[in-house]
A protein has these predicted regions:
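Short beta-strand or tight-loop elements
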Residues: 139, 236, 298-300
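C-terminal active-site/capping subdomain that shapes the small-molecule cofactor and substrate pocket
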Residues: 253-352
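C-terminal substrate-binding/catalytic lobe of Rossmann-fold NAD(P)-dependent dehydrogenases
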Residues: 216-284
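N-terminal Rossmann-like NAD(P) cofactor-binding subdomain of oxidoreductases
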Residues: 1-209, 213-215, 303-307, 341, ...
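A short coil-to-beta-strand element that immediately follows conserved catalytic motifs
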Residues: 31, 180-184, 235-239, 281-285, ...
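Predominant activation on well-ordered alpha-helical scaffold segments within soluble catalytic domains
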Residues: 20, 166-173, 221-225, 269, ...
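Conserved active-site and cofactor/substrate-binding residues in soluble primary-metabolism enzymes
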Residues: 14, 138, 160-167, 215-223, ...
Length: 352
């Protein structure tokens, strides 16, 4: 396959940096532009020194300054890690210009802007007007493992919490073994709060600390409900309590439900293994998943437990990779007809 130019919008954030890292190791995508208005002209390596060997003196590009460098009638892999509320309008502008030049663009948006089917649903959760409501029908949103294929050119990646929870919840709801009400605890690392320190999210507050926030009111909850129903066919009530953990990367989610009849851990595990038998990035484990087994990789670990009528499914992912940049790369591989694992086979370091 001829190399495909790849562009990252919002390239100075943590997810943007992970996308740059993954593109650098990809066999078929070549970085054409790392877009950041605030740092245009600065070397990528100034913001991300660890990417210096891959990016060299490559500068960040300003919005609108890079598209002329993409040859007419060529393909384009467009990744957006731009902020919620800004991503949609940026994507719409680029796609309009690309279409005029015959550029065949596929888009994967990691922001929330295209996770909902209609503008009103998005605006109810995130506030403000949607930046490109005319494009909502052109996007599909799903965890890669929960949608076998799509005929759309553009994909919205679910949020990091949503990804971790859906990997556990969707097969559980599909199994028919449990009532359609889920009780969910999720613990996330500090990178999930972005690069800008805030009173409750930066290191001195989180180190040696653990606390819940937005209990039963997190904005990923309606997203989880919607995507779980789409993937499983079951509308479930989701009671979600997120927590801030004292670590940088990773999400550990625990999903509990009540069994509707007699069921064993073995039956549950067999169902999950069948459901994810063709999913190279999902591993069903004995006992509990562990963050160190997945951090810095695109892997997800899932563990299952059962006692009486209580069923528990646990999942662990890297919030920046499987929950964002890696999942986005999975989707982009599929949109371009590449092996799903291309550029994503690096093993987790284990000792971080």
């Amino acid at each position: 396959m001829t190399s495909v130019p790849a562009v990252v919008l919002g390239a100075t954030g943590y997810v943007g940096g992970e996308l740059l890292r993954l593109i650098a190791a990809h066999p078929h995508f070549d970085l054409a532009a790392a877009v950041s208005e605030s740092r245009a002209g600065e070397p990528v390596s100034k913001t991300f020194p660890h990417l210096g060997a891959a990016c060299g003196d490559t500068p960040f590009a300003a919005h609108g300054a890079w598209l002329d460098g993409i040859p007419a009638n060529s393909p384009l892999a467009l990744f957006s890690a731009a902020p919620h509320g800004a991503s949609a309008a940026m994507i719409a502008n680029i796609l309009e210009q690309a279409q005029a030049r015959g550029i065949a663009a596929h888009t994967v948006d990691v922001s929330a802007d295209f996770r909902y089917r209609d503008a009103a649903a998005y605006e109810a959760v995130y506030g403000g007007s949607h930046g490109a409501p005319q494009l909502l029908g052109d996007f599909v949103c799903a965890v890669p493992e929960h949608l076998a294929g799509t005929d759309t050119q553009h994909v919205a990646h679910p949020g990091c919490f949503a990804t971790a929870i859906l990997l556990a919840a969707v097969p559980l709801l599909q199994s028919g073994f449990v009532a359609p009400e889920l009780f969910v605890t999720g613990i996330t690392g500090s990178t999930g709060s972005g690069r800008t320190p805030q009173a409750g999210t930066h290191h001195p507050e989180r180190h040696s600390n653990l606390y819940a926030y937005k209990a039963l009111d997190h904005r990923h909850t309606p997203e989880i409900v919607n995507l779980a129903e789409t993937a499983s066919g079951t509308h479930a009530r989701v009671n979600f309590v997120p927590h801030s953990g004292p670590f940088a990367r990773g999400i550990f989610a625990t999903v509990q439900a009540k069994a509707t009849g007699k069921v064993s851990t073995g039956q549950l595990r067999e169902f999950f293994e069948s459901r994810y038998s063709d999913s190279p990035f999902v591993r069903i484990v004995d006992g509990s998943p562990k963050l160190k087994n997945v951090v810095a990789s695109n892997m997800a670990e899932i563990g299952i437990a059962q006692s009486g009528d209580t069923v528990v499914v646990m999942s662990a992912i890297d919030n920046l990779v499987k929950g964002a940049a890696g999942g986005a790369m999975q989707w982009m591989n599929r949109l371009f007809g590449q092996p799903e694992t291309a550029g994503l086979t690096a093993l987790p370091p284990g000792w971080t």
